[in-house]
Amino acid sequence: MNIPYISRYKINLSSAVVSCAAFVCMSAYPVFSQPAKGANKFLGNITVMSSIRSDYLKYWNQITGENESKWESVERTRDKMSWAGTDRIAKYSRENGIAWKFHCLVWGSQYPGWMNNLSQSEQLEEITEWLDSAAARYPDVQMIDVINEAYPSHKPPPFKNALGGDGSTGYDWMIKIFKMTRDRWPNAVLIYNDYNTIEWGSEVDWQVKMATAMKKNNSEMDAIGVQAHDAWKVATNTVKGNIDKLAATGYPIIVSEYDIGESNDSRQKQIMEEQFTMFWNHPKIVGVTYWGYIVGRTWRNGTGLLNDGGAERPALTWLVDFVKKNPNPPNDYPKLVKMPDDVSVAPHTTYTIISKKADVSGPMQIFNLQGRLSSSRLENSQPMSVVPVNSAHGCYIINYKDMQGGTIKSLR
């Protein structure tokens, strides 16, 4: 299976003319030296009570919404979608050139209660509408938790029979929802996400069995997300051994919701040193998302890393220093986390630049969000590159129609 790039620039081409949009960002946010900036693995976190703090970019180069994108949060009332929270996350990721993950599409916990009153055919219609709405609004999202916590004693969705149920493979409904997601997001990294799958034996074994079946049946699943909420309670060697078991299925691993529920600073730092070092140096792990970082504003006591006033707990100070000093850990799936500035299309292209306020024919030009043309020059080289000149801080859009192809390099 080809693993797609996590990229801000996603272009799907056919023989027909295709309209595309790419973003070039000169951030107006405070400029911080992110620990993982330029590293071959991402270091992420989540929103803080549906907001994004001004110090976010100081520590993290990947973002996940804690609750904003869950189906229940978006469509609490049938056919009334509330996207404001997810819009903020998508905008922030684009403006700052960091990857974001949509969390999550299907989960048997936080889904709209009105789904329980529908027939299976109606449930399938609503699932399809949910995916269609999200895909139309966020076609460029880099990663998606397609299914969350479907281990039998966790929270498999009660509407799974609308997707085919267990079926002949034992996982028919999962294969179907991944296929439906791939049809709408051809370039996103599609993830199965669950907890206890690197901690406790029976759940590790189930995850291995499930992943093996998904691989055998050519599912569209790209990666396994391991939440790792309880990993801090387990010996690091045991955790690593369980990760090795999952990795043997052939899927990349994302540590998706790690936290350390330890109020003692020294103990939290010790665990962080042991376990994060193992995560970062494991060749099958492509990135780590820590689940919350502000003391007193995380879902579990003791997991925070930064006091509200900005004082770092020792574990965070160590983490920042370690990642900065180790930007190129082993990674067997570097393309999964690469965020290139290249925008690739087919060779020998003529472009028409489209804006609300200007239409310009030519190789490419850059517009701000108000549709005003920004200065640029075209270098006479292959692949071509456009260099913004005298551009103020802000987010810029490159809109163009592909006629026959070419490769553009966008510099931010």
Regions from the PLM with identified roles:
Residues 33, 328-362, 368, 409:
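Residue-level detector of functionally pivotal "anchor" positions at catalytic/ligand-binding pockets or at interdomain
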Residues 334-338, 351, 376, 390-412:
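C-terminal tail/sorting-segment detector
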Residues 75-76, 145, 149-167, 180, ...:
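Aromatic-rich peripheral "rim/lid" segments of glycoside hydrolase catalytic domains that contact
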Residues 44-55, 71-84, 111, 151-155, ...:
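Acidic-and-aromatic substrate-binding clefts and catalytic sites of carbohydrate-active enzymes
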Residues 58-76, 84-199, 262:
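Substrate-binding cleft and catalytic face of glycoside hydrolase catalytic domains
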Residues 34-68:
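Boundary/entry segment of secreted carbohydrate-active catalytic domains
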Residues 366-374, 396:
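Short, glycine-anchored, charge-dense loop/turn motifs used at functional sites
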Residues 77, 82-99, 167-190, 204-266, ...:
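Glycoside hydrolase catalytic-domain groove-lining segments
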